[in-house]
């Protein structure tokens, strides 16, 4: 082939659009016809290979049952929390609502078949022959994990299809001339599919990072071409910012905005994990007394926990049968969560109290006693060691004695202010010294042991109901000591000054503007994503974490085969890994033998350039999509999560075979 390199000031260089000039990756009408036939053929073969009873069977898979339930939640406009972004649920919900398909399993099968169609187009884009491309289809379609996902309603089928569209669009952009109609068509497709991919599963964010890195590499090629003008470079940067960053990010935010605005019905089994701020959005304004008074019954919520209600159960510590267990509960509405606020020295009687002025409000810095309402025992800190944390500076928290016990210094707690900023615009507000429910973030300091009440994510064993451990520490980390008074029951029946709390705002009147502002939406958006992440590893799989300790280690994915895949598939599986190893060895040899001072012109081969260019893309893509799972905080990781990395390794294998064949 003719040498298409251009002459620079000192030596020849490769223009940024060398692939387009050489006709690399140019698709013909026949290629698109083949891709369409691949989709139809794969769909028909798998559909016909099973009976109608197989496709219409009840949801017999945990993943199907979960996805079906979430779809119903979305259609009912009920609140739910799940570890994945919302677009997959929205996609299947729209199909069910509009009755586009009578069976959602057919939709999943079509998405899997479309993934194969785009794989064929991708291999043709990287200049593989049709025979080599067909080999890639044979490899992926015979992976048992991939086949199984096409026969169930799957969280992954949509993500895999969008992923293949992203890779196809990106490779099409890399071989197209900047600013042409073809370039714009592919960058728009990339932008939309990328936005939908990150809105379907969070692994899409890794794909997003891969695309950004690849565009940085394209930018390097662009500025290395001396014939590219400054205007062209500026246009490239602006278009990349728009189509690679802004539009995908906007689609992601719009997807969540649609989800949040769809929540019209509260679901306590899920909403209990959300903050008071978020719950007021779901349940409406919450009316509470403007101050906390002695004699009130309260619930205390630990702000650093998913639910975290301070609770005591009629369970003794194994090491001390006289002391009653105190923990952070995962139940929102439970009698064990209720505590009476008692004065440290006065024995208050409310039978002759007829006016709010006769009630004593609790001030910051004052001491209180916390009596467990259902058992009558007092909250205390002692020198005994907690059941899980047994450091020298840790003290056990328990409930002790009975309802007649008045307590000593170990049962007295100073209430200290951490934060109180809601509706506090005045610097000299007389109400600032009082504790305010739903507003004041507080911590408790024990007078006897001189330690702070603390909750953390460590869970108690089965005898402690797998709830979170509570302890007292001399020098605690402040965020883990932060509590909020979530609800208050007054000790009297008459009316006292009340406030209405709604999405972080306080009003003393019944009329309130319930329209979401941008700041409120961003707060809800940020909290929902954070709770999704923690719900996944701490709630959904946290209690049963031990169950997954013997599961597939992520590091074993590349060398562990599916037992149900064909025998010949073993060679393709290990061959894909071998092709990446060989590529890295070739690149190492190139770097070792590189001499920047030589005056000799290196030989040029377009096939070699294609191999180097797309080989690096495959290596980086494989590594990013694989390495992210080694940092997972839990062990519930299925082999199907290796799909994106396997996809890149197969592309590397096919490109290597094509390079050898040519």
UniProtKB/Swiss-Prot annotation:
GO terms for molecular function: dolichyl-phosphate-mannose-protein mannosyltransferase activity. Pathway: Protein modification; protein glycosylation. It is an enzyme of class 2 (transferase). It comes from the Eukaryota. Keywords: Endoplasmic reticulum, Glycoprotein, Glycosyltransferase, Membrane, Repeat, Transferase, Transmembrane, Transmembrane helix. It is a multi-pass membrane protein. Gene3D superfamilies: 2.80.10.50. Pfam families: MIR, PMT. Residues 289-344, 359-418, 432-488 form the MIR domain. The keyword Endoplasmic reticulum applies. It catalyses: a di-trans,poly-cis-dolichyl beta-D-mannosyl phosphate + L-seryl-[protein] = 3-O-(alpha-D-mannosyl)-L-seryl-[protein] + a di-trans,poly-cis-dolichyl phosphate + H(+); a di-trans,poly-cis-dolichyl beta-D-mannosyl phosphate + L-threonyl-[protein] = 3-O-(alpha-D-mannosyl)-L-threonyl-[protein] + a di-trans,poly-cis-dolichyl phosphate + H(+). Glycans are attached at residue 347. PANTHER family: DOLICHYL-PHOSPHATE-MANNOSE--PROTEIN MANNOSYLTRANSFERASE, PROTEIN O-MANNOSYL-TRANSFERASE 2. This is Probable dolichyl-phosphate-mannose--protein mannosyltransferase 7. It comes from Saccharomyces cerevisiae (strain ATCC 204508 / S288c).
């Amino acid at each position: 082939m003719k040498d298409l390199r251009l002459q620079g000031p000192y030596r020849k260089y490769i223009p940024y659009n060398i692939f387009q000039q050489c006709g690399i990756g140019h698709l013909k009408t026949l290629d698109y016809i083949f891709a369409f036939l691949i989709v139809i053929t794969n769909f028909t073969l798998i559909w016909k290979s099973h009976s109608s009873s197989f496709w219409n069977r009840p949801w017999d898979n945990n993943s199907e049952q979960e996805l079906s339930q979430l779809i119903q939640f979305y259609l009912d406009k009920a609140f739910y929390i799940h570890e994945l972004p919302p677009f997959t649920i929205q996609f299947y919900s729209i199909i069910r609502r509009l009755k586009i398909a009578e069976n959602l399993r057919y939709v999943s099968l079509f998405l899997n078949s479309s993934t194969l169609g785009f794989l064929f187009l991708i291999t043709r884009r990287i200049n593989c022959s049709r025979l080599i491309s067909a080999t890639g289809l044979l490899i992926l379609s015979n992976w048992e994990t991939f086949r199984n996902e096409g026969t169930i309603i799957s969280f992954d089928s949509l993500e895999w299809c969008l992923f293949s569209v992203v890779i196809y669009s990106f490779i099409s952009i890399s071989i197209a001339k900047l600013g042409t109609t073809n370039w714009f068509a592919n960058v728009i497709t990339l932008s939309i599919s990328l936005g939908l991919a990150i809105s379907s599963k969070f692994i899409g964010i890794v794909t997003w990072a891969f695309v950004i890195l690849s565009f940085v590499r394209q930018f390097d090629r662009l500025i290395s071409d001396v014939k590219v003008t400054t205007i062209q470079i500026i246009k490239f940067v602006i278009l990349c910012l728009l189509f690679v960053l802004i539009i995908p990010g906007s689609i992601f935010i719009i997807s969540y905005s649609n989800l949040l605005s769809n929540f019209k019905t509260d679901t306590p089994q899920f909403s209990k994990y959300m903050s008071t701020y978020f719950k007021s959005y779901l349940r409406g304004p919450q009316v509470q007394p403007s101050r906390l008074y002695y004699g009130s019954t309260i619930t205390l919520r630990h702000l650093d926990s998913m639910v975290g209600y301070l609770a005591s159960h009629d369970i003794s510590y194994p090491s001390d049968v006289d002391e009653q267990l105190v923990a952070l509960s995962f139940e929102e509405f439970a009698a064990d969560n209720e505590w009476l606020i008692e004065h440290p020295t006065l024995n208050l009687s409310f039978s002759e109290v007829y006016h709010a002025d006769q009630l004593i409000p609790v001030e910051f810095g004052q001491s209180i006693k916390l009596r467990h309402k259902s058992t009558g025992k007092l909250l205390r800190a002692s020198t005994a060691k907690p059941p899980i944390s047994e450091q020298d500076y840790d003290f056990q928290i328990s409930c002790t004695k009975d309802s007649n016990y008045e307590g000593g210094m170990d049962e007295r707690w100073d209430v200290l202010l951490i934060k109180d900023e809601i509706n506090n615009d005045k610097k000299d507000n007389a109400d600032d010294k009082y504790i305010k429910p739903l507003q004041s973030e507080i911590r408790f300091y024990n007078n006897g042991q001189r330690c702070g009440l603390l909750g953390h994510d460590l869970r108690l064993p089965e005898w402690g109901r797998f709830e979170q451990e509570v302890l007292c520490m001399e020098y605690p980390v402040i965020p883990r000591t932060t509590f909020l008074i979530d609800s208050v029951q007054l000790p009297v029946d008459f009316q006292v000054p009340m406030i209405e709390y709604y999405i972080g705002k306080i009003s003393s009147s019944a009329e309130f503007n319930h329209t979401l502002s941008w700041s409120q939406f961003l707060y809800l958006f940020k909290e929902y994503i954070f709770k999704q992440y923690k719900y996944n590893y701490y709630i959904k799989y946290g209690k049963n974490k031990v169950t997954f300790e013997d599961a597939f280690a992520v590091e074993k994915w590349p060398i562990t085969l599916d037992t149900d895949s064909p025998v010949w598939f073993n060679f393709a599986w290990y061959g894909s890994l071998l092709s990446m190893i060989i590529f890295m060895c070739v690149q190492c040899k190139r770097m070792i033998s590189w001499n920047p001072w030589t005056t000799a012109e290196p030989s040029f081969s377009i096939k070699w350039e294609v191999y180097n260019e797309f080989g690096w893309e495959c290596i980086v893509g494989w590594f990013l999509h694989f390495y992210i799972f080694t940092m997972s905080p839990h062990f519930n990781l299925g082999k199907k999560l290796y799909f994106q990395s396997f996809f890149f390794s197969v592309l590397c294998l096919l490109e290597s075979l094509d390079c050898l064949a040519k």
